[in-house]
Amino acid sequence: MPKSPHRTNLQSFYPIMIILTHLALDSNCWRIRREVDGEEEDIMPSEECYHKYNEENHFKVFSNYLNRKNSSHYSPIAPSYQQALLRLQVKGLKHGEQITKSSGKCNSKKLDTISAETPLRDRALCKFEYVLNYNPKRLPAALTEVKCSCPRPNSKLVGKRIFECEHLRYQVRVLMWDDSCNTFREHVETIALACIPVIQANANADGDDDFIYTIKAEIPI
């Protein structure tokens, strides 16, 4: 008895249905809900290894690497001068916890000698400390950021009060979990990576009269 042509077509169609179903489920598993106003087209440089890697577990591998921490390396973003960092108890991480030893008082005396080997933290005009930015619902959960220790540089170094210390902030894309830790979405975290001396807004009142003056701008031709 000859086979029905419809039965043959259905048998050949089964693998296609399985592949399409797998692709649909796979795309839903890796889709991240974005917390942005508009959906801009993603930039996907072909030379990046991320786009060349064929294994399906790359997200799990990367997330494990990104969130891994121990008592000395508890953040993927950390200062290069590791000697300044304190060792923390990983089970007792607290948001805002200071993770460096104090760099001294705001009006401490000048260093007797300063060389190229002197840590940047000790040579900075604005004293700062490193603190822990911790959120257990975030990936990565632990980030290190800078906190200014003093409102302005040491007057023994800069003279009259025409400068103040402000945080230089950066925005970092992270993943934020829901309360049940079942789903996550893209989120933008703002952290301070530096404490820099800047001219304070009322510098003309605290400094010399001729320190700030008007410059006539030429009209471009």
Curated annotation (Swiss-Prot):
Gene3D superfamilies in alphabetical order: Cystine-knot cytokines (2.10.90.10)
Subcellular location: Secreted
One record GO biological process: response to oxygen levels
Cysteine pairs bridged by disulfides in the record: C148-C195
Keywords, sorted A to Z: Disulfide bond, Glycoprotein, Secreted, Signal
Tissue: Expressed in RMG and AUA interneurons and ASE sensory neurons.
GO MF annotation terms: cytokine activity
Record GO cellular component, one term: extracellular region
Signal peptide positions (record): 1-29
Keyword Metal-binding included in the entry's annotation: no
Protein name: Interleukin cytokine-related protein 17.1
